[in-house]
UniProtKB/Swiss-Prot annotation:
Pathway: Cofactor biosynthesis; thiamine diphosphate biosynthesis. Pfam families: ThiI (PF02568), ThiI_fer (PF22025), THUMP (PF02926). Residues 60-165 form the THUMP domain. This is Probable tRNA sulfurtransferase. Belongs to the ThiI family. It is an enzyme of class 2 (transferase). CDD domains: PPase_ThiI, THUMP_ThiI. GO terms for biological process: thiamine biosynthetic process; thiamine diphosphate biosynthetic process; thiazole biosynthetic process; tRNA 4-thiouridine biosynthesis. GO terms for molecular function: ATP binding; CCA tRNA nucleotidyltransferase activity; tRNA binding; tRNA-uracil-4 sulfurtransferase activity.
């Protein structure tokens, strides 16, 4: 079937009242960014939905990209025709003929936004259904569980016919809720946390701490690949790679062993907070889940958080590890996260980390060490790169070879 349009229905945007227009504009910008290589498409929007005119572009390719865009509740490939009965009948029959097999069932559902149309909804359903039955073989009606639900939307300017309704990613358009920094390691948790933050409308930049030679270039590439996995939900992702070797070596030398993990997390948070301020973000995102590991007890979080007044967002706080892993499989980060290249946190994990550290104690231990020069040095040596989704990166560099 030659589909010529895609109809896009909004998710939570429909509840945003006075801010509705800005949310729709943000979603439109995000869709344009993701579909920027499809030069022929045109966009139209109103209060209830958006439509894309394909103008010959590949509909299946575009649909596969739309599935990852937050703010879309659902979308459908559609055929457009004039709002005239004979045109609708002809188009409906062509749509069914392109989909059905003998033995299939179908149902016609009409939405008549154009109230001056010559037939009402029930009469239209009967008219179109009768026309299809008369001109096909082996097709019957099932109004409860049809194989082919033919939906007809009649508007004054045009009529749209759809058959398949695809589920969208839901949530809010990326960037509609502001910007935050994601502390991105190479594990399962932080990429999933980044996904959920983006789903709630946050524009996310990632911060990764890199400690060569203790961590390898492969570990660095692993994190870049994870950022690329997340980039498909926002078009691209900015990744800040922080040199952390000297800071970790000083921690190991000067801080009691069972408090090294707490000190490491506190210093990471301070550096991430400086990057956040420079990048004009308003929060920091972590992949912490309450009680999952020693650094994620409530006492640890309290002692670590004390170094900043910046909001710390923890999208996974109530999730089990198995739930997080299942989600990582769903969003496409699992296969990268299982690669056996350790990050700086796992390399320097003490044998018996303090699970209930005291804020006063870690502050006492840190008071004997001047970390500020190393924090400044790490901040000055940050490598900032833009990471694209796997497909976009392939397209971007394909012409070079």
């Amino acid at each position: 079937m030659n589909y010529d349009h895609i109809l896009i229905r909004f998710g939570e945007i429909s509840t945003k009242g006075k801010n509705r227009r800005s949310f729709i504009e943000r979603l439109k910008q995000n869709i344009r960014l993701v579909l920027k290589d499809y030069k022929k498409v045109k966009y139209f929007s109103n209060r209830d939905r958006m439509s894309i005119t394909l103008n010959g572009e590949n509909p299946e390719e575009i649909c596969s990209l739309l599935k990852n865009i937050f703010g879309i509740q659902s979308f459908s490939l559609a055929i457009k025709c004039e709002s005239k009965l004979e045109d609708i009948k002809k188009t409906a029959l062509a749509a069914i003929e392109g989909e059905y097999k003998p033995g299939n069932t179908f149902k016609v559902e009409t939405k008549r936004a154009y109230k001056q149309f010559e037939l009402d909804t029930n009469a239209m359903n009967a008219e179109i259904g009768g026309h299809i039955l008369k001109n096909t073989d082996g097709l019957t009606v099932d109004v409860k569980h049809p194989d082919i639900p033919l939906r007809i939307e009649i508007r004054e300017e045009a009529t749209f016919l759809t058959i398949r309704n695809e589920k969208g990613a839901g949530g809010l358009p990326v960037g509609s809720a502001g910007k935050a920094m994601l502390m991105l390691s190479g594990g399962f948790d932080s990429p999933v946390a980044g996904f959920y933050a983006m789903k709630r409308g946050l524009s996310v930049e990632a911060v990764h701490f890199f400690s060569p030679p203790y961590t390898s270039e492969r570990a660095k590439q692993k994190v870049m690949d994870l950022a690329g996995c997340l980039a498909k939900f926002g078009g691209s992702m900015t990744l800040h790679i922080v040199p952390f070797t000297k800071t970790q070596e000083l921690i190991q030398k000067q801080i009691p062993e069972n408090y090294t993990m707490t000190a490491t997390r506190r210093l990471m948070l301070q550096i991430a907070d400086r990057i956040r301020e420079e990048r004009k973000a308003l929060a920091i995102i972590t992949g912490e889940s309450l009680g999952q590991v020693a650094s994620q007890t409530l006492e640890s979080m309290y002692a670590i958080n004390a170094v900043t007044a910046t909001p710390i967002l923890r999208p996974l706080i109530g999730m089990d590890k198995t739930e997080i892993i299942e989600k990582s499989k769903e969003i496409g980060t699992y296969e990268t996260s299982i690669q056996p290249f350790e990050d700086c946190c796992t390399i320097f994990t003490p044998p018996s980390p303090k699970t209930r550290p005291k804020k006063e104690k870690i502050e006492h231990f840190e008071s004997f060490v001047d970390f500020e020069p190393l924090i400044a040095e790490a901040a000055a040596g940050i490598e900032t790169i833009t990471v694209y989704s796997e497909q976009e990166a392939h397209d971007k560099f394909a012409g070079l070879f």
